[in-house]
Amino acid sequence: MATIEFIEAREILDSRGNPTVEVEMILDDGTQARAAVPSGASTGQFEAVELRDGDKKRYSGKGVLKAVENVNEKIAEEVLGCDASEQRIIDQIMIELDGSDNKGKLGANAILGVSLAAAHAAADCAELPLYQYLGGPNSHVLPVPMMNILNGGAHADSDVDIQEFMIAPIGAESFKQAYEWGAAVYHSLKKVLKDKGLATGLGDEGGFAPNLPSNAAALDLILDAIKAAGFEPGKDVALALDVAASEFFEDGKYTFEGQAKTSAEMIAYYEGLIAKYPLVSIEDPLDEEDWDGWAEFTKKLGEKIQIVGDDLFVTNPKRLAKGIETKAANALLVKVNQIGSLSETIDAVELAHRNGYRCMMSHRSGETEDTTIADLAVALSTGQIKSGAPARGERIAKYNQLLRIEEELGDSAEYAGASAFPRFQA
């Protein structure tokens, strides 16, 4: 395998108009690769640190020139000459160079940019698609696209508490068909909203962001859209939520729909939703430090529904290990920039799978045209991916890459479908 001959980072803009890091890499055989780093709006307090400049004169303090400089001057000096295929060694060099427990010195955005660029370069050098290079010749499962078609919470300016209302085309026979169904429901929802005189402005992730009286009202609108598009809710297209409960948790209480609620009251609320709606997955239903609540929720409803830890686990093997020990959640949300390196991301997924936890690959609200997570979803057999609505270039870039992968795999491609969720297990 070729060695790393050149590395250069630059500051680019993400889908929210905020700066992020992009890294170019050239190997000594001439192979060139590039990777860009995403950024979140609702972030868990235990995530790896995204290094920002803090200079209010540039991009309201959100510039990433320090992270860029750390790549070009500090990281490059250590990894130039490394074999590009030695992913774990490259990542470990950067982690040790940083020396902190949260990548706060060099910046997770600096480290991840180099980590992902190295993987792309090594795959290109080996003349393999990224998903096959990382996952091996048996990588063939296409994930269910969890499409965020209605936004609330931190992703929208509305009265809806729940951050993401997603559709999951579980009844489709292929990713291509699932993508088509998702787009059909998305356009159907736009018509439903228009017919009711509701706004059709978009949130960060391409979903609609109308001002609605309640979270149940949002679910009812989506059910109407599914039916209007000619699909059967629960059989063809199911529902999923990302509550992002840490965003409205303070002083031991959840301020939800205008009332202060306890963990037990929130669990009872979700129990009612699961009984009424065809929900297959609920992400971050409780605060990231409410371990007892998570364990109780999982004990009570874990056989019926996927309970996903995002802010709870932050793609961190150590926090996931605590979740496994305390029986909190039954699925891991996978965000490469939460942990800040590819090898640690893979470690988290492998730990989850070994312990019977499902995984959902995920974008961030601040995205670029980078498609790495699409390949990762197939490489790591996550069976699920969320990359926003079937709209906006930075969202569909990932879904379109999955179309290409499915086409390339041909008859060996398998769509995860309903089997990806506990609600449909025998």
UniProtKB/Swiss-Prot annotation:
<feature type="active site" description="Proton donor">
    <location>
        <position position="205"/>
    </location>
</feature>
<feature type="binding site">
    <location>
        <position position="364"/>
    </location>
    <ligand>
        <name>(2R)-2-phosphoglycerate</name>
    </ligand>
</feature>
<dbReference type="InterPro" id="IPR029017">
    <property type="entry name" value="Enolase-like_N"/>
</dbReference>
<dbReference type="Pfam" id="PF03952">
    <property type="entry name" value="Enolase_N"/>
</dbReference>
<dbReference type="GO" id="GO:0009986">
    <property type="term" value="C:cell surface"/>
</dbReference>
<keyword id="KW-0324">Glycolysis</keyword>
<feature type="binding site">
    <location>
        <position position="283"/>
    </location>
    <ligand>
        <name>Mg(2+)</name>
    </ligand>
</feature>
<feature type="active site" description="Proton acceptor">
    <location>
        <position position="335"/>
    </location>
</feature>
<feature type="binding site">
    <location>
        <position position="386"/>
    </location>
    <ligand>
        <name>(2R)-2-phosphoglycerate</name>
    </ligand>
</feature>
<feature type="binding site">
    <location>
        <position position="242"/>
    </location>
    <ligand>
        <name>Mg(2+)</name>
    </ligand>
</feature>
<dbReference type="GO" id="GO:0000015">
    <property type="term" value="C:phosphopyruvate hydratase complex"/>
</dbReference>
<protein>
    <recommendedName>
        <fullName>Enolase</fullName>
        <ecNumber>4.2.1.11</ecNumber>
    </recommendedName>
</protein>
<feature type="binding site">
    <location>
        <position position="310"/>
    </location>
    <ligand>
        <name>Mg(2+)</name>
    </ligand>
</feature>
<dbReference type="GO" id="GO:0004634">
    <property type="term" value="F:phosphopyruvate hydratase activity"/>
</dbReference>
<keyword id="KW-0460">Magnesium</keyword>
<feature type="binding site">
    <location>
        <position position="163"/>
    </location>
    <ligand>
        <name>(2R)-2-phosphoglycerate</name>
    </ligand>
</feature>
<dbReference type="GO" id="GO:0005576">
    <property type="term" value="C:extracellular region"/>
</dbReference>
<comment type="pathway">
    <text>Carbohydrate degradation; glycolysis; pyruvate from D-glyceraldehyde 3-phosphate: step 4/5.</text>
</comment>
<feature type="binding site">
    <location>
        <position position="365"/>
    </location>
    <ligand>
        <name>(2R)-2-phosphoglycerate</name>
    </ligand>
</feature>
<dbReference type="InterPro" id="IPR000941">
    <property type="entry name" value="Enolase"/>
</dbReference>
<dbReference type="InterPro" id="IPR020811">
    <property type="entry name" value="Enolase_N"/>
</dbReference>
<feature type="binding site">
    <location>
        <position position="335"/>
    </location>
    <ligand>
        <name>(2R)-2-phosphoglycerate</name>
    </ligand>
</feature>
<dbReference type="InterPro" id="IPR020809">
    <property type="entry name" value="Enolase_CS"/>
</dbReference>
<comment type="function">
    <text>Catalyzes the reversible conversion of 2-phosphoglycerate (2-PG) into phosphoenolpyruvate (PEP). It is essential for the degradation of carbohydrates via glycolysis.</text>
</comment>
<keyword id="KW-0479">Metal-binding</keyword>
<keyword id="KW-0456">Lyase</keyword>
<dbReference type="Pfam" id="PF00113">
    <property type="entry name" value="Enolase_C"/>
</dbReference>
<keyword id="KW-0964">Secreted</keyword>
<dbReference type="GO" id="GO:0006096">
    <property type="term" value="P:glycolytic process"/>
</dbReference>
<dbReference type="InterPro" id="IPR020810">
    <property type="entry name" value="Enolase_C"/>
</dbReference>
<comment type="similarity">
    <text>Belongs to the enolase family.</text>
</comment>
<dbReference type="GO" id="GO:0000287">
    <property type="term" value="F:magnesium ion binding"/>
</dbReference>
<dbReference type="InterPro" id="IPR036849">
    <property type="entry name" value="Enolase-like_C_sf"/>
</dbReference>
<keyword id="KW-0963">Cytoplasm</keyword>
